[in-house]
């Protein structure tokens, strides 16, 4: 599987969404929130446990770890 799970992205880093995996309801919810292939996101908070806060389309979204694992992304380096 290319890329990393979004749960692995440290706070303060950006990534490009590569793909979504998981059950249809999870994928549908994530896509509705803007987590679609090609979208750039920024990790606001990732403490290694509990929910993450991700900025997508200028909106902060709280994701559970299970949801974040379903998102494959490519880290963007400056």
Q: What are the residue ranges of the model-derived segments?
A:
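Short, basic/aromatic beta-hairpin or loop at an interaction surface
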Residues: 8-21
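Conserved beta-strand/loop element in small beta-rich adapter and peptidoglycan-binding domains
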Residues: 37-43
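Short alpha-helix capping/helix-loop boundary micro-motifs
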Residues: 2, 25-29
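Short, charged beta-turn/beta-strand-edge "cap" motif at the junction between a beta-strand
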Residues: 4, 23, 45-50
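C-terminal structural segments of small proteins and small subunits
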Residues: 12, 46-78
